[in-house]
Amino acid sequence: MLTLIQGKKIVNDLRSRLAFEYNGQLIKILSKNIIAVGSLRREEKMLNDVDLLIIVPEKKLLKHVLPNIRIKDFSFSVKVCGERKCVLFIEWKKNTYQLDLFTALAEEKPYAVLHFTGPVSYLIRIRAALKKKNYKLNQYGLFKNQTLVPLKITTEKELIKELGFTYRIPKKRL
């Protein structure tokens, strides 16, 4: 367990330290492509872990980011890691914390931010309402009859409004 303040400090420390190895080179992950999600974004007082969403600029890089993740000046161990999710244990100020990393492509960003911020109860209500209209919403997009529905949106707030719901800031979601 860690406090919200500790979680925010960890994220600030990580922002300039995340990179991945690709074709023998170390590629820095830009701070603007690292988004705090989960209980940290909802500003819960106590956190079980730190969740970060990494926006990957090119599809060809997606399979390389998490399996080849590097954190400058941090000691960490990998619990499990794939193309879209990686669970790490990081050493920070003499304690060990769980860090969950997720990836999304730029066009998936609004959907992924909503999905990984949650909370689950909020997402269930939205998805149930959409299901009645034969839509499926997940972290990759909005689908109707298994076909991606293109929406001209770039933010989570625009997504919520486009779906016909009232936007609530993450800490006010139930």
UniProtKB/Swiss-Prot annotation:
Pfam families: DNA_pol_B_thumb (PF14791). The keyword Membrane does not apply. GO terms for cellular component: virion component. GO terms for biological process: double-strand break repair via nonhomologous end joining. In the presence of magnesium, pol X shows a strong preference for the ssDNA gaps having one and two nucleotides. Transmembrane segments: none annotated. It catalyses: DNA(n) + a 2'-deoxyribonucleoside 5'-triphosphate = DNA(n+1) + diphosphate. Its main location: virion. It comes from the Viruses. GO terms for molecular function: DNA binding; DNA-directed DNA polymerase activity; metal ion binding. Its cofactor is Mg(2+). SUPFAM superfamilies: Nucleotidyltransferase. Disulfide bonds join C81-C86. This is Repair DNA polymerase X. Small DNA polymerase formed from only a palm and a C-terminal subdomain. The total DNA-binding site of pol X is composed of two DNA-binding subsites.
